[in-house]
Regions:
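Active-site-adjacent betaalpha module
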Residues: 49-78, 106-109, 131-248
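Cleavable N-terminal signal peptides
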Residues: 36-37, 47
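Acidic/histidine-rich, surface-exposed loop or edge segments in extracytoplasmic proteins
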Residues: 80-91
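Von Willebrand factor
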Residues: 108-127
């Protein structure tokens, strides 16, 4: 705080005038008083002790990502049919999966006709005594495998089973695949983790949003998956829909 002394003041008590610094302090005090008043009226900012769970109902969903039409080269594209079996794709657990079957079947038919590599996945049971290990015959008939189409078994990340390679990477590389299209269940497990891992491994990843199903009818799992897949600077995933995919 600056002091201004006149000749008169030099001979007597000092008179201190308000400077810029003093005015700033007054403004700060005024703002603090306003904040205290706002708190009393219930308009205070959220407490630092609040968590994302406390704020759950007040969080607004981000804008929806844009879907893109894609034309894929059959020679370098693989369609990964992910766990579309009766145990996981039914009206009780995942009604969206059931309603997506006709469109997935249409895409599968077009893929086979164009010579696209089709790969199937299963998952091992964590409790075989109460939930037997799924087998390939559990696939929904409309989208079941044909001939010698390969099958890999894993949990969410279809490239790895624990610390072991599932063979998916080798299948893709041996066939010259550069683009993968995972469809099926579950959106926030098998689709999400396989898509991200494929992107990390250098593959182009195309995910049809109406070809993945989460738990229940709400659509929250699918929305969250779509947001995560497209909101990263580390990996790139293209979102599309089943009828926006062409092979040429």
């Amino acid at each position: 705080m600056a002091l201004r002394l006149t000749a008169k003041q030099a001979a007597g008590p000092l008179e201190i005038t308000k400077t810029t610094g003093e005015r700033t302090m007054s403004q700060i005090r005024y703002l603090l008083q306003l904040a205290a008043l706002a708190a009393m009226l219930g308009y205070a900012l959220p407490s630092s002790a609040e968590t994302i769970i406390d704020e759950w109902q007040n969080i607004k969903a981000p804008p929806p990502p844009q879907l893109q039409a894609v034309t894929l080269d059959p020679k370098t594209t693989a369609l990964i049919m992910t766990d579309i079996i009766k145990q996981t794709c039914n009206n009780e657990m995942r009604p969206r999966c059931v309603t997506s079957i006709p469109k997935i079947e249409k895409l599968l038919t077009a893929a086979r006709a164009s010579g696209v590599t089709v790969i199937y996945t299963l998952f091992p049971s964590r409790s075989p005594a109460t939930f037997p290990n799924p087998v390939i015959s559990d696939y929904i008939p409309a989208v079941a495998p044909k001939g010698d189409e390969p099958v890999v078994t894993s949990f969410a990340d279809k490239f790895m089973l624990g610390d072991k390679d599932t063979g998916l990477q080798k299948i893709l590389k041996d066939k010259g695949i550069t683009t993968v299209v995972p469809v099926g269940v579950v959106a926030h497990n098998g689709i999400l983790f396989t898509a991200v891992e494929a992107a990390f491994r250098g593959f182009n990843v195309i995910v049809p949003v109406d070809g993945m199903a989460g738990n229940g009818p709400s659509g929250y799992d699918e929305q969250a998956t779509a947001h995560i897949l497209t909101d990263s600077i580390v990996y790139k995933v293209t979102l599309t829909s089943l009828d926006m995919i062409k092979f040429q």
